[in-house]
């Protein structure tokens, strides 16, 4: 138990895939990078996980081994991983995950997703478009030039 959170380290073969994908899919910060099929494809199944309680929050741990030392790394074509949860991810939860992570790996070079805030982490520019609103609401925010260009493209049969 770390900071009041019960986080378990699971090896790939111990993970309940249906519950894993359900947790990632229902997360407000859901990304394809967190689903098991993507992780399996990008790491040849060489990933483990940190799981909170009964899959309330999950974090994939993509690892490699060099010189007998296991370390965390970002897989190719994977912008970000980190913690996925349908509930709010607090800095306290992020801290508990990081504390659990450092007990298992001596070195890590990973990029957490935009939903994993923590005061001690270095942030990078990450352009995330919030597209959860309906299309008419999104369309109402278009600039006049874009609306004009879309109308012209539709008139020319391009869209």
Where do the model's predicted regions map?
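Acyltransferase donor/substrate-recognition loop-hinge adjacent to the catalytic core
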Residues: 1-15, 117-159
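Short Pro/Gly-enriched beta-strand edge/turn motifs at strand-loop
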Residues: 29-37
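Non-catalytic accessory segments adjacent to catalytic cores
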Residues: 90-126
């Amino acid at each position: 138990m770390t900071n009041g959170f019960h986080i378990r380290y699971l090896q790939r073969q111990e993970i309940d895939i249906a519950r894993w994908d359900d947790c990632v899919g229902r997360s407000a910060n859901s990304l394809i990078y967190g689903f098991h099929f993507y992780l399996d494809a990008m790491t040849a199944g060489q990933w483990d996980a940190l799981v909170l309680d009964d899959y309330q929050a999950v974090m994939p741990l993509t690892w490699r081994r060099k010189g007998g030392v296991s370390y965390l790394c970002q897989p190719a074509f994977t912008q970000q991983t980190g913690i996925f949860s349908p509930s709010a991810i607090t800095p306290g939860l992020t801290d508990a995950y990081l504390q659990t992570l450092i007990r298992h790996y001596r070195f890590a070079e990973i990029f957490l997703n935009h939903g994993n805030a923590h005061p001690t982490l270095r942030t990078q520019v990450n352009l995330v478009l919030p597209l959860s609103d309906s299309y008419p609401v999104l369309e109402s925010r278009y600039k006049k030039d874009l609306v004009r260009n879309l109308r012209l493209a539709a008139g020319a049969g391009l869209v």
